[in-house]
Amino acid sequence: TNTPEQQCYLQAKCYIEFYVVV
């Protein structure tokens, strides 16, 4: 079961967004 967070973690695009959110 892959959670959206994990998938986002793999994607650089989402990674940047996640980084900004933190």
Swiss-Prot record:
EC number of this enzyme: 3.4.24.-
Expressing tissues: Expressed by the venom gland.
EC class: hydrolase
Domain of life where this protein originates: Eukaryota
Keyword NAD: no
GO molecular function, one term: metallopeptidase activity
Stretches assigned to the Peptidase M12B domain: 14-22
Cofactor note: Binds 1 zinc ion per subunit.
Processing after translation: N-glycosylated.
The keyword Nucleus is assigned to this record: no
GO biological process: proteolysis
Additional free-text comment from the UniProt record: Negative results: does not show proteolytic activity on rabbit IgG, human C3 and C4 complement components, fibrinogen, beta-casein, hemoglobin, ferritin, myoglobin, chymotrypsinogen, and melittin.
Subunit structure: Heterotrimer; disulfide-linked. The heterotrimer consists of 1 metalloproteinase chain and 2 lectin chains.
Family the entry assigns: Belongs to the venom metalloproteinase (M12B) family. P-III subfamily. P-IIId sub-subfamily.
Name this polypeptide is given: Zinc metalloproteinase oxiagin
Organism phylogeny: Eukaryota, Metazoa, Chordata, Craniata, Vertebrata
